[in-house]
Amino acid sequence: MPGRRDTEDEITAQLQLNLTAPILLTRAALPALRASGNGLVVMMSSAIGLVEMPFYGTYAATKAGIAQFAEALRRELYGEGVGVLTVYPGATSTPMMSSSDAGADLGFDYESPDEVASAMLAAIADDEISVVRGGSERSAMIAANRDDPASVDEKLAGMKADLERAVSEHSSI
């Protein structure tokens, strides 16, 4: 929950970095993208934007928000020669994740940035509208969250203490 760990400044920074900045950048780039007749907007969401995890409330909200913005934008731009791709990486071995001890046992299958980039490039080549990463465990959790969210609540409740310990020093900004 944002109130447990994130300061007001951290909450504001996450909203600005993960939601406000991409929206404003897209707005500034749209005239040139439209004029090109063959543009592409790539939005970086997160698998946590699809299945929200305890202790990542603010981060999940920003990533779900950018995914919803991307979907609305894709529909707004449909037929105008500008596509929108939303990327939902799972845990990625970046400096941001270096302070997290959450591993595969908690559903965090780490990938390299190169693996995420390769998947994104493949999705672009195939004219996909989204690419979801994070391994088979994450895919199963996404499906369960859509079909039976209470089962995900129950599963995460059983992991909550371990997850809290694993991410106690982690900052998602």
Task: Give residue ranges: language-model regions.
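C-terminal helical subdomain
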Residues: 86, 102-140
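Active-site helix of classical SDR
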Residues: 26, 62
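Residue(s) in the substrate-gating loop at a strand-loop-helix junction
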Residues: 46
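Alpha-helical segment proximal to the catalytic Tyr-Lys
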Residues: 31, 75-76
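Conserved mid-core segment of classical short-chain dehydrogenase/reductases
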Residues: 1-12, 55
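A short helix-coil junction within the Rossmann-fold of NAD(P)-dependent oxidoreductases
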Residues: 28-37
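Active-site loop-to-helix junction immediately N-terminal to the catalytic Tyr of the SDR YXXXK motif
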Residues: 52-60, 72
